[in-house]
Amino acid sequence: MRILLKLFVESQNLGKAINALSEGGISGFYLKEYQGMSPDDWKGFLLAEEPEMAIKIVNELSQDTVVINSIVNIECLGKIKELVRKKLENDRYTLVELPVLGMEVNSPE
């Protein structure tokens, strides 16, 4: 079985995260940069319902974050998780595992 592994890390920890995944045996990945916030970041206040104001507040409080996505064999998952825990033990991260029910790859020459 294959798993879509999604590893969310702060941008400054991207190198450590990719190294952990590579050592764990991933064959490739793609990543997406975004602005991230944890529940603690917005605890205690409500966002204004005006879109411009809400976007401004989110931009001011959020952190530069990256999600790294990789399809992995379930047999590699334990090793990958162990390496991520070890390399990012003092850093914030979130690891999400989603089952892949199907996949089609088209690679014309």
Curated annotation (Swiss-Prot):
InterPro entries for this protein: N-reg_PII-like_a/b (IPR011322), Unchr_N-regulatory-PII-rel (IPR019296)
Family according to the record: To M.jannaschii MJ1244 and MJ1245 and M.thermoautotrophicum MTH1110.
Protein name stated in the entry: Uncharacterized protein MMP0618
